[in-house]
A protein has these predicted regions:
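Core transmembrane alpha-helical segments of multi-pass membrane transporters/permeases
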Residues: 1-38
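Membrane-interface alpha-helices at helix entry/exit sites of multi-pass transporters
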Residues: 55, 94-106, 135-146
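Juxtamembrane and boundary regions of transmembrane helices in multi-pass small-molecule transporters
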Residues: 111-182
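Hydrophobic alpha-helical transmembrane segments of multi-pass integral membrane proteins
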Residues: 20-24, 48-89, 101-104
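Re-entrant/interfacial helical elements at transmembrane boundaries that shape
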Residues: 38-41, 76-91, 121-134
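Loop-to-transmembrane-helix entry motif
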Residues: 9-13, 17, 46, 50, ...
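Hydrophobic core segments of alpha-helical transmembrane domains in multi-pass membrane transport
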Residues: 20-28, 58-69, 150-167
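Short helix-coil transition sites and intra-membrane helix breaks within transmembrane domains
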Residues: 28-37, 68-81, 114-122
Length: 182
């Protein structure tokens, strides 16, 4: 009986195992080919050649992070995809380049203020259930429409605080400088 129950439960895992295998294969090939390094170095060279560095670069990275957040729900999955390319790219783009801590702080800002706007947020169904306590017609569209002003306000304030922080040259924490190399 136990063996049959275990076999039945593993039958449901087949699609996940195949997906995990494909994802692991993609990650291994990405690492083996050094494609992340090639994209990062080429991207940094391109950014420097067109003079796109400094605060506009950080601001753009925040917006890219926010845009990707609308389509990829997991923060750790987004960081796993973005970090191998963007951390070295922003470290190399500009003199001095941004430290990994600064890049991650910018990523977290972009990731944070669009969370409530994506239906991929794991807690979105819970938000809808709570909203329907007060408005039975509340749904995905009405929740997103209601949250846009809050999200935009939170995003603008967060970005401004971060950019002022960078302009003042304040460290992000003990031993966490803004720029690569201190």
């Amino acid at each position: 009986d136990v063996a049959d129950m275990m076999a039945d439960s593993m039958a449901d895992m087949g699609a996940y195992i195949v997906l995990a295998f494909a994802a692991a294969h993609f990650i291994a090939m990405f690492e083996w080919s050094n494609l992340g390094s090639i994209i990062a170095i080429s991207g940094a060279d391109l950014l420097q050649s067109v003079g796109f560095t400094g605060l506009p670069l950080l601001f753009s990275f925040i917006l890219v992070s926010a845009l990707i957040n609308l389509f990829v729900g997991s923060a750790s999955a987004k960081w796993a995809i973005m970090a191998p390319v963007f951390v070295p790219m922003l470290m190399l783009a500009g003199e001095p380049g941004y430290s990994p801590e600064t890049v991650q702080a910018a990523y977290r800002i972009g990731d944070s203020f669009t969370n409530i706007l994506t239906p991929l947020l794991p807690y979105f169904p819970l938000v809808i259930i709570f909203a329907q306590r007060y408005d039975e017609d509340a749904g995905i569209g009405s929740i997103i429409a209601l949250m846009v002003p809050y999200s935009v306000s939170f995003g603008v304030v967060s970005i401004l605080v971060f950019l002022v922080w960078v302009l003042l040259g304040l460290p992000l924490g003990p031993g966490a400088e803004l720029y690569y190399g201190g």
